[in-house]
Amino acid sequence: VLHYLTTPKFENKPRDCERPLAIMHVPKTAGTSVVTGISQSLKVSEEVRGIDGLLLGTFDRFSEFDDEVSRTIYLDLSKMPDAKLIMGHFSRNTLTARYPDAQLLTFLREPLSRLLSHWVYWRCMSDEYLARWGAWQDCIKLSRGTLREFLTDPRIACQTDNLATRMLLWPDKRIGNDSFIDPERDSSLLRDALNRLNAFAYSDVIENPHFHANLSKWLNIELPVMHLNPTDRVPENLRIRLDKELDQETLWLLDHRCRLDAKLWASLARRRLPKGGEIPSLQRQITLKAIARYGALLAP
């Protein structure tokens, strides 16, 4: 009860159709289906999609990217065109700096299930696709090793370590681009991340049974129901037993890489889910289902 009373209320603001809409899409939150539905429904003439430098850590060999990939990466805010709809893996800072008048929207997913999905999704990427990313493919290929290796390589801490928190706060000296977050900074980072999330015009957890209806009502449109960009069955040569991956150390790493995001998600879930729901029980249910799902996709 005390936690409920002391955390932000995350009260959604009314939609202002005169203002741009900017979506902070956290990877693997089922956001591709949502943003595509929003795009198709709003039918705006100016739209921006892509990513910023947050997801690339300290990587700087951008000249190796093929042209199609390069067009989706915005390292210079001045090169982001004016738009009414901005959707992508952009940090909050990128969105507010380039589109200060935009209403911000984001969704959170239970973070351990999101992180497992991220690992398996990368593991499914073909060599042909990865070649378009130049030397960054070496970082994505870390997903082809053990889950423990994926969770401990600092080159991809920018995507594996409390990603939602990073997207809310980046750039921030307390968060390294190629290092894991120091637990001694957790309290101040969580406080600031909660306050940033509280300032969004609209936010929700994707596990909300009324997620689709509530978002449609806020946007004053009927969003189509889609299921795009799902995580596929892992290629045969990369299949492993997930139960053997989840030893005590790896389970600790999963919890540690999600510790801040888990508190963000739980705080928002308490405000969004029907009253009476037990958040810890729901979180366990979601993670157990995720382990079963991704275990099946990985199974030899």
What role is predicted for each listed range?
Residues 89-90, 177, 207, 224-296:
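PAPS-dependent sulfotransferase catalytic core
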Residues 24-34:
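Glycine-rich phosphate-binding P-loop
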